[in-house]
C-alpha cells in the first residue's frame, strides 16, 4: 500500500474568498465591531486567527468576550474598515493619507502582518518631502526597520531639507529620537556643523518648550562643537535664549579652547573635531603646471564602452605627449587639487598662499602642512619667472574643517628640496638647499604642543634632493640625494640614514643598490620602498627590510618619470604626473600609476591629471563631501538660527 501527501496552494485563498462571501451575505457572522458609530459584522474564528488582540479577548472568560457587539477604541472607522478588508482578503489598500489610520487600527488590534506591510510601504515611498513624517509614524508605532530607513533618508537629504526651511520640511516636528540620530550621524554630507547646531536650537525653542528642553543635553551633545566657528559658539553660550545644561556648556568651553590654541589642534582631535562624511582624497600641492584654464571638476578620461577599447600603448602615449610639449608653457602654481582615487575625479580645493616649487608637505591630525620651497621674488601674480625665485622658511597649515590657511611659525632656516615628516607630536625638516643655495645638513623640529622650532641632530653630511619616510615606531629614514650644489655639482648618493624616536645621532645603514636624487620613499607594511628619481635609466624600485638591514630590487616601473608626486592610499603607492625623458627631452606625463604590493606589479589606473604638472607634492587628507561654495554664509545663517 502506498501513501502520498499533496498540498493545494489555492486552498488558503479559497478559504479567504469563502469568508469574504459569508461576510458580504452577513451569514454566520457572530460578532459586530463598533467604532465611531459604525458597525462591522465579522466572524470570531477569523478574527482570532488574524489578531492577537481578538485571540486573547475571545479566550478570556469575561462578559465582553461573549458580547455580540464589541466596542473598539479605534480612532478611525475607515482604518478599521481597511484592516478588516485585509483580514478577509489579504489585500491592504494604503496611501500616505491613510497609512497612519491603518497603523492605528493594526497596532490596537495587534495585526502584526498589517504592521509589517505598512512599514514596508512607508519605506518604499520614502522621499525628501515625506521622510520626516515617515520617521514620526515609525517611531510612534515601533517600526524599527522603517524608522532606521527614514532617518537615513533624512540624513542623506538634509541639505535639501534645510534649504527648504526646517519648518516647512518637517524637521522642527521631528521626534526627538530621530533628531538625535540625525545630529549624531557620521555621514551627514554638505551641511556645515553650524547649521546642525542651529537646527537643534530651533527645535528646542518649539512648543511645548518645557517638554522639548528635557532633550537638550542628548541633542546638543551630538553636535560637533569643534567644527562650529568660535563666534557662533560664543553667541550660543551667552545669547541662545536657552538655559544650557552643564554638559553642553562644558562641550562649548572645550571647543572654544580648541579654537584659541591653533598650534595644538592636531593633537586635540576627537569626535568633536572630526569631519562628517569624510572622503579620502589625495591632495596635489604646488609645483609647476602647464598654463591652461583651471577646471573646477574634471572627470577622468574613460575608455570607450567601459574598457572594451584598449588604451594606447605607452609608446603612442609618449609620442602624443611629446607633441603637446612643443606648445607647453610652465608656471609656478598655487593650486591645491583634490583627487578622488576611487572615482577618478579631480576638484580644485584651495590655493596656496604663494606659488611654490621645491617645497615639502606632511600631515598631522588631518591638517596639511606646507613647508619651505622656492617662491617668486616678485608678486604672486607673476609666478612664471624661473630665474627670480627665493628660498623661504615659511610654513602654512591648511584646515579642511574650515577651508582655511593658518601661518605657522617659520622654520629656523629657509629650505628647498628637502624632506619633512610628522613624527609623534613634532614635525621634522631635514637638509635641503638654503637661502644662499648652500646645501644643508641641519635638521630642525617643530613642537606642535609648544608651537616653536628647535634644532635637532644634524645629518652626517649636507644633502638636498633626498627622500624620507617615517616608519614603524616613529623611525625616520633618509636616503640618496646630493651633497653638492646644483644638479650637476655632485653625483647622486646611495646612502641611507636612520634616526630613532629617542635618538639624536643618525645611524648609517646599508646603502641602496641605486644612487638616487629627487626620488621618493614610502613605508608599506613595515618595509621602506625607494621609488625612482632623476637620471635613473633603468627605473628600478627597491625595498628595505629594517630588521635585516637589507635592500631588495623589485620590478621596475615600465617607463621612467621624475618630479612626480607620491601618495599612499590603502597600501597602494601612487605616482602622479611629473616628467619623463623622450629623445633627450623632458616631456610631461599626466597619468597615474599604482604599485601592487602583493603582486610586485605596476598598473596604470586609467586616469589623467587635469593638466601637465611637475614638481608637485602629495598628501592624503580626509575632506568633507561637497564644494567650498556650500560654506558661504555659514556663520551668518548659524547666527540667525542661534538668535532665533
Swiss-Prot record:
The keyword Cytoplasm does not apply. One of its GO terms (cellular component) is extracellular space. Residues 313-329 have a biased composition (Acidic residues). Residues 131-238 form the BACK domain. Gene3D superfamilies: 1.25.40.420, Kelch-type beta propeller, Potassium Channel Kv1.1, Chain A. SMART domains: BACK, BTB, Kelch. Keywords: Kelch repeat, Repeat. Residues 29-96 form the BTB domain. Kelch repeats lie at residues 320-366, 367-425, 426-473, 475-526, 528-571, 573-623. This is Kelch-like protein 34. The gene is KLHL34.
Amino acid at each position: 500500500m502506498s501513501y502520498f501527501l499533496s498540498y493545494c496552494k489555492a486552498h488558503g485563498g479559497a478559504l479567504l474568498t469563502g469568508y469574504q462571501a459569508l461576510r458580504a451575505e452577513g451569514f454566520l457572522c457572530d460578532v459586530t465591531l463598533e467604532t465611531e458609530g459604525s458597525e462591522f459584522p465579522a466572524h470570531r474564528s477569523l478574527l482570532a486567527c488574524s489578531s492577537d488582540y481578538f485571540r486573547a479577548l475571545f479566550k478570556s472568560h469575561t462578559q465582553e468576550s461573549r458580547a455580540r457587539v464589541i466596542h473598539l477604541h479605534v480612532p478611525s472607522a475607515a482604518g478599521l474598515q481597511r484592516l478588516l478588508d485585509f483580514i478577509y482578503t489579504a489585500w491592504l489598500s494604503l496611501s500616505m493619507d491613510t497609512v497612519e489610520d491603518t497603523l492605528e487600527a493594526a497596532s490596537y488590534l495587534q495585526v502584526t502582518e498589517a504592521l509589517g506591510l505598512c512599514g514596508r510601504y512607508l519605506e518604499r515611498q520614502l522621499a525628501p518631502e515625506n521622510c520626516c513624517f515617515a520617521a514620526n509614524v515609525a517611531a510612534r508605532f515601533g517600526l524599527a526597520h522603517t524608522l532606521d530607513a527614514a532617518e537615513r533618508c533624512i540624513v542623506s537629504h538634509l541639505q535639501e531639507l534645510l534649504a527648504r526651511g526646517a519648518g516647512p520640511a518637517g524637521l522642527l516636528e521631528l521626534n526627538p529620537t530621530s533628531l538625535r540620530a540625525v545630529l549624531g550621524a557620521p555621514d551627514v554630507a554638505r551641511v556645515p556643523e553650524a547649521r546642525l547646531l542651529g537646527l537643534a536650537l530651533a527645535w528646542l525653542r518649539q512648543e511645548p518648550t518645557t517638554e522639548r528642553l528635557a532633550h537638550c543635553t542628548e541633542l546638543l551633545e551630538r553636535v560637533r562643537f569643534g567644527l562650529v566657528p568660535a563666534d557662533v559658539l560664543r553667541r550660543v553660550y551667552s545669547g541662545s535664549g536657552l538655559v544650557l545644561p552643564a554638559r553642553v556648556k562644558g562641550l562649548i568651553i572645550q571647543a572654544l579652547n580648541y579654537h584659541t590654541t591653533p598650534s595644538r589642534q592636531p593633537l586635540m582631535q576627537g569626535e568633536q573635531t572630526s569631519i562628517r562624511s569624510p572622503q579620502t582624497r589625495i591632495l596635489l600641492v604646488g609645483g609647476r603646471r602647464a598654463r591652461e584654464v583651471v577646471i573646477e571638476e574634471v572627470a577622468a578620461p574613460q575608455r570607450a564602452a567601459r574598457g572594451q577599447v584598449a588604451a594606447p600603448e605607452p609608446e603612442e602615449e609618449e609620442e602624443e605627449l611629446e607633441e603637446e610639449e612643443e606648445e607647453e608653457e610652465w608656471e609656478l602654481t598655487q593650486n591645491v587639487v583634490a583627487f578622488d582615487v576611487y572615482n577618478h575625479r579631480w576638484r580644485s580645493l584651495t590655493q596656496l598662499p604663494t606659488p611654490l616649487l621645491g617645497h615639502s608637505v606632511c600631515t598631522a591630525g588631518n591638517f596639511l602642512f606646507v613647508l619651505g620651497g622656492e617662491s617668486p621674488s616678485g608678486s604672486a601674480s607673476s609666478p612664471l619667472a624661473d630665474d627670480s625665485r627665493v628660498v623661504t622658511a615659511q610654513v602654512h597649515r591648511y584646515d579642511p574643517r574650515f577651508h582655511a590657511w593658518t601661518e605657522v611659525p617659520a622654520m629656523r632656516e629657509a629650505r628647498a628640496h628637502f624632506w619633512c615628516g610628522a613624527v609623534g607630536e613634532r614635525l621634522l625638516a631635514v637638509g635641503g638647499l638654503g637661502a644662499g643655495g648652500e646645501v644643508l645638513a641641519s635638521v630642525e623640529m617643530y613642537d606642535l604642543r609648544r608651537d616653536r622650532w628647535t634644532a635637532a641632530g644634524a645629518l652626517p653630511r649636507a644633502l638636498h634632493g633626498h627622500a624620507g619616510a617615517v616608519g614603524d615606531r616613529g623611525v625616520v629614514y633618509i636616503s640618496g640625494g646630493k651633497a653638492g650644489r646644483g644638479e650637476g655639482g655632485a653625483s647622486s648618493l646611495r646612502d641611507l640614514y636612520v634616526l630613532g624616536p629617542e635618538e639624536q645621532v643618525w645611524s648609517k645603514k646599508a646603502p641602496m643598490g641605486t644612487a638616487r636624487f629627487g626620488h621618493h620613499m614610502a613605508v608599506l607594511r613595515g618595509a621602506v620602498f625607494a621609488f625612482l628619481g632623476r637620471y635613473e635609466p633603468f627605473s628600478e624600485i627597491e625595498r628595505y627590510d629594517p630588521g635585516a638591514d637589507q635592500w631588495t630590487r623589485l620590478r621596475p616601473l615600465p617607463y621612467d618619470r621624475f618630479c612626480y608626486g607620491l601618495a599612499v592610499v590603502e597600501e597602494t603607492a601612487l605616482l602622479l604626473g611629473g616628467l619623463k625623458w623622450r629623445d633627450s627631452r623632458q616631456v610631461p606625463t599626466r597619468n597615474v600609476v599604482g604599485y601592487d604590493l602583493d603582486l610586485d606589479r605596476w598598473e596604470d589606473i586609467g586616469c589623467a591629471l587635469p593638466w601637465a604638472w611637475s614638481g608637485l607634492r602629495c598628501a592624503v587628507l580626509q575632506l568633507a563631501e561637497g564644494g567650498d561654495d556650500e560654506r558661504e554664509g555659514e556663520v551668518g545663517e548659524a547666527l540667525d538660527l542661534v538668535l532665533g
